[in-house]
Amino acid sequence: MSESLIAIVPAAGIGARASLPGEAAVPKQYRPLAGQPMLRHAVRALLADPRIVQVRVAVSAGDGWVEQALAGLPRTVWRPCGGPNRADTVAAALADSGAAADDWILVHDAARPGLPAAALARLIDACLDDAVGGLLALPVADTVKAGRQRVSRTVDRDGLWLAQTPQMFRAGLLRDALARARAAGLAVTDEASAVEAAGHAPRLVAGALRNFKVTWPDDFELMEKWL
């Protein structure tokens, strides 16, 4: 395989929803889980597959936690490329990586420390021969309701999936998709959204329950049990 596999972890946010009122303002990705920062777990999960040649962590300028959080991890670098939103952070990290157009980029949430090695391998295996690339996802199992304080309707869950990460695309395709989305003023919440907006159909690859995104305060206790 001539193309390299490079992982990008956007870690420039603060994760305010994960904090309880009055808690110290330690960014979510640096809060401890099973004795280690959550970000370290997420990066180690990516390093479990030797086909990933490097993990690049994008942090905010002046980040005072990352060096200690990731000390000693192989094939890992961190760079102050954090932007005002996820898409800008990923685009900056991609530009900083020096990746060739045909290299594969795997973007993974810092708040998904429970990524199983089998799910990561499944994604890579499925995407290496795919013309577009893809993402880990889970079919929606629960009944879905739309509404604010009251239900306005029940949404047909047939064909609905919950997007996870990593999301894996060629560097050239992803770079172009993110640039197009920005030029069009599209608010994309993940890389697949940008790729879809560029006219492509990413592949859906079975994810894992334990690969959920740590978002709310109670999620830390649940993830501790997985780790």
Swiss-Prot record:
Keywords: Isoprene biosynthesis, Nucleotidyltransferase, Transferase. One of its GO terms (molecular function) is 2-C-methyl-D-erythritol 4-phosphate cytidylyltransferase activity. GO terms for biological process: isopentenyl diphosphate biosynthetic process, methylerythritol 4-phosphate pathway. InterPro entries: IspD, IspD/TarI, IspD/TarI_cytidylyltransf_bact, ISPD_synthase_CS, Nucleotide-diphossugar_trans. The keyword Nucleotidyltransferase applies. It catalyses: 2-C-methyl-D-erythritol 4-phosphate + CTP + H(+) = 4-CDP-2-C-methyl-D-erythritol + diphosphate. Pathway: Isoprenoid biosynthesis; isopentenyl diphosphate biosynthesis via DXP pathway; isopentenyl diphosphate from 1-deoxy-D-xylulose 5-phosphate: step 2/6. HAMAP family: IspD. Belongs to the IspD/TarI cytidylyltransferase family. IspD subfamily. Catalyzes the formation of 4-diphosphocytidyl-2-C-methyl-D-erythritol from CTP and 2-C-methyl-D-erythritol 4-phosphate (MEP). This is 2-C-methyl-D-erythritol 4-phosphate cytidylyltransferase. It comes from Bordetella pertussis (strain Tohama I / ATCC BAA-589 / NCTC 13251).
